[in-house]
Amino acid sequence: MYSILIIEDDKRVADLLKTGLEENGYHTMVAYDGVMGLRLFQSHSFQLVISDIILPKLDGFELCKEIRKANPHIPVLMLTALGSTDDKLDGFD
């Protein structure tokens, strides 16, 4: 089964993503901060990570760097309300 890690501090957004994905046959796990997300990533096998950028304890940019170090082949989809060009470019790093 395809497993997806959702890292989102807004419970409503996390629940919306979780429900939509599970209704389409995906297994999901949710973390509400970057540190919890990294721990889940390190202790489980995921095929995709969906993460907010503005997160407590460890922001999405740093989290993504840690995920890339551990497994550069796992796709990371960044969700955010940030819209500046600099923010978008930071997401590619």
Where are each of the predicted segments found?
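N-terminal/domain-start alpha-helical segments
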Residues: M1-D93
